[in-house]
Amino acid sequence: MEIALDDHDDEDLQSGLTALVVTVVELLVEALEGEAVRRMESGSLSDAEIERLGSQLQALEAELDRLQADQDIEAAVDEFKDDLDHVLRDAITQMSEADSTPGFEPQHSADGDSGGGSA
């Protein structure tokens, strides 16, 4: 999915940005769900917390679905997710190939950082 800023079509720009924001929020919800499952399995959540968390995540997903339908951006959100999936798969493949390359050693800075920087 591309957002063409030089297109001067405000509706397309708004739709594209909305799809991007919804995609990011959906990915965050997926991460939250994974963390919730991890905490449930570890026993660190009470039954009431599990119920409340499940209800909140369900409500958030329903609102995201409604927003996608109202804005007619389902296909754009799916396209963003597919594009991100391809980027991640390519990055993982490249990292795996680099790790299996004989003589390859990641460069480290003087402070022990691998050069990735900090955010």
Swiss-Prot record:
The keyword Metal-binding does not apply. Induction: In PHH4 (a deletion of the p-vac locus) transcribed in all growth phases, maximal expression in mid-stationary phase. An unstable 6kb transcript able to cover gvpD-gvpE-gvpF-gvpG-gvpH-gvpI-gvpJ-gvpK-gvpL-gvpM is detected, as well as smaller transcripts. Gas vesicles appear earlier when grown in static culture, possibly due to O(2)-limitation. GO terms for cellular component: gas vesicle. Keywords: Gas vesicle, Plasmid. GO terms for biological process: gas vesicle organization. It holds the Pfam family GvpK. The keyword 4Fe-4S does not apply. It is found in: Gas vesicle. Residues 92-119 are annotated as: Disordered. InterPro entries: GvpK. Encoded in a 14-gene locus called c-vac which produces cylindrical gas vesicles only in the stationary growth phase. GvpF to GvpM interact with each other in vitro, and may form multi-subunit complex(es). Belongs to the gas vesicle GvpK family. PANTHER family: PROTEIN GVPK 1. Proteins GvpF to GvpM might be involved in nucleating gas vesicle formation. Gas vesicles are hollow, gas filled proteinaceous nanostructures found in several microbial planktonic microorganisms. They allow positioning of halobacteria at the optimal depth for growth in the poorly aerated, shallow brine pools of their habitat. This is Gas vesicle protein K2.
